[in-house]
């Protein structure tokens, strides 16, 4: 009988612990939002210097982009329109920002947030179609 009486307390404690974890993760994601917004807006802004924008790319994305030409030559050729950041979602070490009519995906690195994909358009249930992306 004591076991049954103790179980509700265990469940409540477990729920409180899980709730605390969710609150902790939500706090981390909201703290990251301004940085994600700043990086996404700068990368999508065609008036920002190409080298500064290239520095915002994740290493594998930079490598993929430079298969055809140097990043500083490639970025000005792409149809970036810039615009206001309309929304930001952060989860774990990843983020998504909607800038103007585009979607930007980012990853958190030791050096801060880096762009993994940009100039992305949704395709319903299929993965986004991105003009800039890593492997």
Predicted regions and their residues:
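Sec-dependent bacterial lipoprotein signal peptides
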Residues: 1-26
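Short, intrinsically disordered, charge-biased short linear motifs at domain edges
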Residues: 13-15, 40-42, 55-61, 107-108, ...
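Bacterial signal peptide processing site
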Residues: 29-31
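Short solvent-exposed beta->alpha transition segments
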Residues: 34-41, 45-89
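Exposed beta-strand-loop-beta-strand "reactive/processing" segments of non-cytosolic proteins
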Residues: 80-106
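Short beta-strand edge/turn micro-motifs at domain boundaries
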Residues: 103-134
């Amino acid at each position: 009988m004591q076991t049954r009486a103790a179980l509700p307390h265990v469940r409540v404690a477990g729920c409180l612990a899980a709730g605390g974890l969710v609150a902790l993760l939500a706090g981390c994601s909201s703290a990251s939002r301004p940085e994600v917004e700043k990086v996404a807006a700068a990368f999508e802004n065609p008036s920002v210097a190409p080298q500064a924008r290239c520095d915002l790319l994740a290493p594998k994305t930079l490598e993929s982009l430079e298969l055809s030409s140097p990043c500083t030559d490639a970025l000005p050729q792409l149809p970036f329109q810039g615009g206001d950041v309309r929304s930001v979602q952060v989860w774990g070490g990843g983020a998504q920002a909607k800038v103007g009519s585009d979607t930007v995906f980012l990853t958190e690195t030791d050096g801060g947030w880096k762009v993994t994909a940009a100039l992305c358009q949704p395709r319903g249930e299929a993965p986004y179609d991105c003009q800039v992306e890593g492997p």
